[in-house]
Amino acid sequence: MDFYGTIGPACADVKLLQQMVEAGMTGIRMNLSHGPLAAHKDWLALLRKAGVKKLLIDLQGPELRIGRLPQQLSLTAGQTVRLGAQGIPCPAALVHSVQPGQELLLDDGKLLARVDTAEPDALVCTVVRGGVLQSRKSLATPGADIQMPTLTAEDKENLAIAADCGVTGVMLPFVRGAADIRSLRQALAEAGAPGLKILAKIENLAGVQALPEFLPLVDEVVIARGDLGNAMPLWELPRCQKQLSAACRAAGVPFMVVTQMLDSMHTRAVPTRAEVSDIYNAVLDGASSLMLTGETAAGQYPVQAMEYLVRTARTAM
């Protein structure tokens, strides 16, 4: 079984990474939504020194994110905010596709805004659930059909150097169907890296519904519960996870479970009972891989989080 961490400021240290490997970590995810692969040469060098063997890059793909902010924003309930021109930067496709009355979920649903007015180049919204918003955080609009390309220009640049950087697998966000996988396969071939593993992230209802058509085309499925939980009432997410797990098992396709596995360990040295139970059950469901994201990238206890992930999973094996 594979255990992945996510590299970030909290673990960007050779000794910490080595301790995570000693705890059982078998690979690292690098999130390229926050910067291109070429800009992370220092992290790549750290991973080599620490003896990390597997490196997954998480592309931008058709994912919606806000742009760069001069500084983080503190948003409060009832506040009016603009997304688009003269406001929080966001994709033009979002502005052109969303209607008044629809909701916007930001940062995996931590913040919620309602669209009041749709202008030609901006959305005027009211904050329903406030919080701190940082650059490049995710955006989701339940029920909206927003057409985004499978790969961005930056994604293709990252793929062109992936093999030389030691990348072993590519994670494609928000897979909507077989066409997305074929586009990535073609891009990998053009980049001279046809042997890299493809991991399809299921993060919306389109991906859930299209799973049977692209299952034969991928090396692994990623049940990415953050944005997937924004696509449905949250109480339906556990059932969806179980159904996706069963479909992958039946097809003989490996699958990974990710997002908030040990979320409390951002700030606590010991996880909750619910979190370790979640890990244990994911293994019983047949998961071939588990991954930590913010727990290792930005949390206070990256090594301890990896220890709990590995030890709990191995107890279930």
Kindly give the residue locations of the regions a language model identified.
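Non-catalytic helical/linker scaffolds that mediate oligomerization, partner binding
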Residues: 1-317
